[in-house]
């Protein structure tokens, strides 16, 4: 009987853990200045302010018109949906090489530094075509944060 109880507990933990991750998607900031609040309402105090349009964030929860987000550095809070959009960006978590084509054998165009905000145009397999200030090219998706 104890074994059956343990099996049920493990099953439910795995099942509910999977459900909680299903709501996690990446979003981006619509504006250059976005308030992050302690709670999911305009009456909640402002916790901090983001000042970077297109910054990717992970949505981890939702309540009515607010989304709970977490950033690359594990800062979290609530943002109104009017300030968010479908993610079109990512951040390099390590220095990366930008290539002309989606292969490591292609001509290297530039070195992308860790922390650089990247605008994602499209992805194929484990490569994404990105733009970053002066450069446009392909980058491997490993060590990139913000991709759905």
Predicted ranges, named:
Residues 40-44:
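Second-shell loop/turn segments in exported
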């Amino acid at each position: 009987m104890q074994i059956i109880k343990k099996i049920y507990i493990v099953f439910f933990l795995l099942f509910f853990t999977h459900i909680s991750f299903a709501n996690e998607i990446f979003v981006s900031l619509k504006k250059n200045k976005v308030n992050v609040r302690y709670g999911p309402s305009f009456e909640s105090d402002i916790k901090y302010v983001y000042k970077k349009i297109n910054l990717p964030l992970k949505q981890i929860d939702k309540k009515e018109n607010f989304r709970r987000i977490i950033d690359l550095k594990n800062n979290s809070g609530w943002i109104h949906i009017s300030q968010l959009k479908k993610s079109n960006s990512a951040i390099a978590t390590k220095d990366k090489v930008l290539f002309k084509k989606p292969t490591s054998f292609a001509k290297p165009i530039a070195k992308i530094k860790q922390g650089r905000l990247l605008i994602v145009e499209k992805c194929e397999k484990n490569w994404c075509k990105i733009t970053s200030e002066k450069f446009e090219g392909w980058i491997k998706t490993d060590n990139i944060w913000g991709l759905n």
